[in-house]
């Protein structure tokens, strides 16, 4: 895989994941208690022996830069690197990134310097585990100019995706963006061509793009330089290229989830706690997900009742009940609390005991969850200070609300408490 360079698209302003992207780039959003979204594609690359990795981003890239610099240091005897490339304005191009393809186009001068044969283009907000070596080998074996990784899906979910049709050789011959009705029926294909059994093919007669592509070097450069007005890979570049180039489909038949919205992000995190077998597991020593080593102490539990939950390292939990939840590193939960079906991202630091005591005496709220607080169906971002006897339960079943001055939003019925927010004692949300 020395002849492959990976480009991870960090996305735009992250409006679908707002307010989690208020102070950070989308790839830097914490996931599963201790990781960040960027760790998923980077780990997949490392496990696939791809060590040349660029991450393209446009907004709030400081925490992403810091995380990557501390985590992925390939100094030594190979050419490996993980580098963040932020959008920049130049005399030749005064614009920011206009789309996924435009982001790559603006850095072609840098990509060109490397002696590689293929470019692997990935998204920064998906949860999955994939060996890209098999994907790239299929690309080479079929002599493809472009290969798309696709998933088989059933009729119920099909209209939510960009679908495609293939011929008997696996070549993509048609695209349709989120079709409905008769247009949807026309996009049915025989997915057994890609390796499914007849029974599986009948249940899942559609294929959808995962937003993962591999390009021949000369094809990528030609398409981006000749079609300057086309700014998006999935909607413009690849559908147009399928007319003149050999665009192949590669079937990925394992867990894959786009977690680019608050609702999908919330459910994907809580699904990690499912028993006996979650849909995605971080407990795979043959293909681990890497992240920054923090050297934190073990978690301390004092008279707690915990069921179906994930607790990050360095947490302190006192006489509380945690059910079907994910708690991030350095989470602090005081006595009498009930946390149900919630994602707590933890904290970036510990408050000293003296500082916490002074905060309580002065009626300030320390970092963490105060005594007798109930949190249900919520996401609590990092370093939140939640007082005692608070109820975050969305009691009125509100679906959408913006209360930034009060420290929270509601997205798809999920209460999202902002990073560094302060929720006073006795508050009911």
Swiss-Prot record:
Enzyme Commission identifier(s): 2.7.7.27
GO molecular function, one term: glucose-1-phosphate adenylyltransferase activity
Recorded metabolic or biological pathway in which this protein acts: Glycan biosynthesis; glycogen biosynthesis
Keyword field: ATP-binding, Carbohydrate metabolism, Glycogen biosynthesis, Glycogen metabolism, Nucleotide-binding, Nucleotidyltransferase, Transferase
Any GO BP annotation: glycogen biosynthetic process
CDD domains named among the record's database cross-references: ADP_Glucose_PP, LbH_G1P_AT_C
Keyword Nucleotidyltransferase part of the UniProt annotation: yes
Keyword Transferase attributed: yes
A GO CC annotation given for this chain: carboxysome
Binding site residues for alpha-D-glucose 1-phosphate: 162, 177-178, 209
Record field: catalytic activity: alpha-D-glucose 1-phosphate + ATP + H(+) = ADP-alpha-D-glucose + diphosphate
InterPro entries on file: ADP-Glc_PPase, ADP_Glu_pyroP_CS, GlgC_bac, NTP_transferase_dom, Nucleotide-diphossugar_trans, Trimer_LpxA-like_sf
Top-level EC class: transferase
Assembly behavior: Homotetramer.
Record family assignment: Belongs to the bacterial/plant glucose-1-phosphate adenylyltransferase family.
Classification via PANTHER family: GLUCOSE-1-PHOSPHATE ADENYLYLTRANSFERASE LARGE SUBUNIT 1, CHLOROPLASTIC-RELATED, GLUCOSE-1-PHOSPHATE ADENYLYLTRANSFERASE-RELATED
HAMAP family: GlgC
Function, as annotated: Involved in the biosynthesis of ADP-glucose, a building block required for the elongation reactions to produce glycogen. Catalyzes the reaction between ATP and alpha-D-glucose 1-phosphate (G1P) to produce pyrophosphate and ADP-Glc.
Name this polypeptide is given: Glucose-1-phosphate adenylyltransferase
Natural source organism: Nostoc punctiforme (strain ATCC 29133 / PCC 73102)
Gene from which the chain derives: glgC
């Amino acid at each position: 895989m020395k002849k492959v360079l990976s480009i991870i698209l960090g996305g735009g302003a992250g409006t679908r994941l707002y307010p989690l992207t208020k102070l950070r780039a989308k790839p830097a959003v914490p996931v599963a208690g201790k990781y960040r979204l960027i760790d998923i594609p980077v780990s997949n690359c490392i496990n696939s022996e791809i060590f040349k990795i660029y991450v393209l981003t446009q907004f709030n890239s400081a925490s992403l830069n810091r995380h990557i610099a501390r985590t992925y240091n390939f100094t030594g005897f190979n050419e490996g690197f993980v580098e963040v490339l932020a959008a920049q304005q130049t005399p030749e191009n005064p614009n920011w990134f206009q789309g996924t393809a435009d982001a790559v186009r603006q850095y072609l001068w840098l990509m060109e310097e490397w002696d590689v044969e293929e470019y692997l283009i990935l998204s920064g907000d998906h949860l999955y585990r994939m060996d890209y070596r098999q994907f790239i080998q299929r690309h080479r074996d079929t002599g493809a100019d472009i290969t798309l990784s696709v998933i088989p899906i059933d009729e119920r979910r099909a209209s939510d995706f960009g679908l495609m049709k293939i011929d008997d050789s696996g070549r993509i011959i048609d695209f349709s963006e989120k079709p409905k009705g008769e247009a949807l029926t026309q996009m049915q294909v025989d997915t057994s061509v890609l390796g499914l059994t007849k029974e599986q093919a009948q249940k899942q007669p559609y294929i959808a793009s995962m937003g993962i592509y591999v390009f021949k070097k000369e094809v990528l450069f030609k398409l981006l330089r000749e079609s300057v007005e086309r700014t998006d890979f999935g909607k413009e570049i690849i559908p147009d290229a399928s007319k003149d180039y050999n665009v192949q489909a590669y079937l990925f038949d394992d867990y894959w989830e786009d977690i680019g919205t608050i609702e999908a992000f919330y459910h994907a995190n809580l699904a990690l706690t499912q028993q006996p077998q979650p849909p995605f597991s971080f407990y795979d020593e043959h293909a681990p997900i890497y992240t920054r080593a923090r050297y934190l102490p073990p978690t301390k539990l004092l008279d707690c009742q915990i069921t179906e939950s994930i607790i990050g390292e360095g947490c302190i939990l006192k006489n509380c009940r945690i059910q079907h939840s994910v708690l991030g590193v350095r989470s602090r939960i005081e006595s009498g609390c009930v946390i149900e079906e919630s994602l707590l991202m933890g904290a970036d630091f510990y408050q000293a005991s003296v500082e916490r005591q002074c905060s309580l005496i002065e009626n300030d709220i320390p970092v963490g969850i105060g005594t007798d607080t109930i949190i249900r169906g919520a996401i609590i971002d990092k370093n939140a200070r939640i007082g005692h006897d608070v109820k975050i339960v969305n009691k009125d079943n509100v679906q959408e609300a913006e209360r930034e001055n009060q420290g929270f939003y509601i997205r798809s019925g999920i209460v999202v408490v902002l990073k560094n927010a302060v929720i006073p004692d006795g508050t009911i949300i």
